[in-house]
Each structure stands twice: as structure tokens, then as C-alpha cells.
A protein has these predicted regions:
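Bacterial N-terminal signal peptides that target proteins for export
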Residues: 2-20
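Hydrophobic alpha-helical elements and their junctions with loops/disorder across both membrane
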Residues: 28-31, 244
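Expand to "…catalyze enediolate/carbanion chemistry for C-C bond making/breaking, isomerization
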Residues: 35-298
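Bacterial N-terminal signal peptides
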Residues: 17-29
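Extended rod-forming repeat segments used as scaffolds/tethers
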Residues: 12, 23-26, 219
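Short linear Ser/Thr-Pro motifs
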Residues: 11, 30-31, 214
Length: 298
């Protein structure tokens, strides 16, 4: 604990590898998610689970409907992948969503871009994970890191936001240790410098964007050249001591992956509807539909 305080006093945040190592030690000694006076104070449970060697899965949300968001937040996902790059969601809408249901799933935002405005708005409304799309230059991810972190580590300004109401009065002192940075590798240019991207201390996760890699290269999964590209990204990430991410369809089918993007809410609604129409529950057992509106026979 004292070691972390000394390091933090010098740099503003200890190297993520040291943070996670100390988190793992603390969690081994205290089997609760929120240990008394942890060093550093961790409330991002995704960091805690990864430090324990567990895999994490996030559901994808692209709609501003609060009922849908809160259902996803309490469905059992480790985090929610709030999709702002490929949706019409506004920061005001996402702020309302996160405030309505800040957990149990931790809010991660895929920002439209890695600009100062996008990054600072995302963290100010309470995101504990920043997913940066199309990382194909060091400048892009370094810029995102800079504006996601308070000084002395970064240049995040201290302004208005709802983060304090969500994560506690000591947020300013603990934010740098709780906000995760996910770099998405979506094209050959990003794959070419993935070793440099993964080596950046404040990059926590490198995401292998399976569909976009296929789109940009013209290759399909299973093609030897595609698989070589995916393996290159994975190996460089693991060599740097970081976590490898991919689609949830790869969970259990590819080694070395710890962080997964799950299906969007629309796909899950469709899956649930099909199960209901077949008279089955998600455990595959037959179920009848109760005559009372709004309930199910279980």
C-alpha cells in the first residue's frame, strides 16, 4: 500500500501493470469487490476481474431507451459497450442512461473519435472505459490517453460532470486508476504498429476488430493471411502484458482472449422473442406462457 502511495505521488498514476498486480494481491487477501482502503482505490470491477484472471463480457447498447439500458446493465454483463460511433446517441442521452443505472455493469463508451471533446465528455458523464476506434497511429491513442487522465499523467480538465455522484467524492484522486483504455485495431495500418500501441503503458486492452479487419483486407476468417494478422495482434498484445479483446463469438474458441464484446440489445431481444415463441426458457427447458399480461409461467 505504501509503495503505491509513493509511486502515485511522483507520477499521478502507477503503471497499469503495477496497479493490476497490487489489485490482485489485495483481492486475494480480501474476497470482496471493494476492499477497505485499497491502494489504489478500485471501483472498476472490470479491472478487478481481469486482475483475477477472469474473462469479461460486455453487452452492446445503441439505444437511449432507459428500460432497455437498465435491463442490459442488470442482465449479468461485466460492462456495457455503449455504442456512439455507429449510432445516433448523444452525450446527453448517454449521461442520462448511465445516471439511471450505473451498474452492476460498468459503462464503457466507444467514442465517435479520439478527439479531446469526445474523450472528456465521455469521462465527465461517468464512463470508466474508453474504447477508441480505428487506432492506426500512435498519435490517435496517445491523444485519447492524454485527455482521459487528470494531471500530472494527462491533460483532462476539471469541469462539470456527474462522475462524482456516480463514483464518489474521491473521484479526482482515483479516476486515473479506474478508467480503462481500449485500442481497436481495425485495419492493416493499425496492425502494422500494434506492438507500439500495446507497449503504451496506459493502453489496457487491444481489441481485434474481426469484421473490419476482414473488410479492410478483403480476407475472411479462416484464410491463412487473415489468421496470421489476427495472431500478430494477439501475440504483440500479450507480449506487452495487456489484455486481448474480440467478439463474444470467439469466447471459448480462441486462446489468449480476456475481453469480449457481446451482442447488441436488438439481437438479444430477438433471441428472447424466439425462445418465448418456442415455449422455451434460456436453459432450453419447456415453459408455458402465463395468461397474465406481463408475466411468464416459470
Amino acid at each position: 500500500m505504501q509503495t503505491m502511495n509513493l509511486v502515485g505521488a511522483v507520477s499521478g498514476r502507477a503503471p497499469r501493470s503495477l496497479t493490476l498486480a497490487l489489485a490482485a494481491v489485495a483481492l486475494a487477501a480480501v474476497p470482496t469487490a471493494h476492499a477497505a482502503e485499497p491502494a489504489p482505490a478500485l471501483y472498476n470491477t472490470v479491472i478487478e476481474k481481469l486482475a483475477r484472471g477472469e474473462q469479461v463480457v460486455g453487452g452492446t447498447v445503441s439505444t437511449a431507451d432507459l428500460n432497455v439500458y437498465c435491463a442490459m446493465a442488470s442482465a449479468g454483463f461485466d460492462f456495457l459497450w455503449i455504442e456512439m460511433q455507429h449510432s445516433s446517441l448523444t452525450y446527453q442521452e448517454v449521461a442520462t442512461m448511465i445516471r439511471a443505472c450505473p451498474g452492476p455493469a460498468i459503462p464503457f463508451i466507444r467514442v465517435p473519435d479520439g478527439t479531446e471533446g469526445d474523450i472528456q465528455k465521455a469521462v465527465d458523464i461517468g464512463a470508466l472505459g474508453i474504447i477508441v476506434p480505428m487506432v492506426d497511429t500512435l498519435e490517435k491513442i496517445q491523444n485519447a490517453i492524454t485527455f482521459a487522465n487528470y494531471p500530472p499523467l494527462g491533460k483532462r480538465s476539471q469541469g462539470g460532470g456527474q462522475y462524482g455522484a456516480l463514483w464518489g467524492r474521491n473521484y479526482r484522486q482515483t479516476a486515473n486508476d479506474n478508467i480503462m483504455m481500449v485500442a481497436m485495431i481495425e485495419n492493416p495500418a493499425g496492425a502494422e504498429i500494434v506492438d507500439q500501441i500495446a507497449a503504451l503503458d496506459d493502453v489496457d486492452v487491444v481489441f481485434v476488430a474481426s469484421s473490419d479487419l476482414s473488410s479492410f483486407t478483403g480476407l475472411r476468417q479462416g484464410d491463412p493471411s487473415y489468421e496470421a494478422l489476427v495472431t500478430k495482434i494477439k501475440d504483440a498484445t500479450l507480449k506487452a502484458g495487456k489484455y486481448v479483446a474480440g467478439p463474444s463469438a470467439w469466447k471459448g474458441t480462441r486462446d489468449g482472449y480476456s475481453f469480449f464484446q457481446g451482442p447488441p440489445e436488438t439481437a438479444l431481444i430477438q433471441s428472447g422473442a424466439r425462445l418465448s415463441l418456442r415455449g422455451e426458457a434460456d436453459d432450453g427447458q419447456p415453459r408455458g406462457v402465463a395468461p397474465m399480461e406481463g408475466s411468464e409461467g416459470r
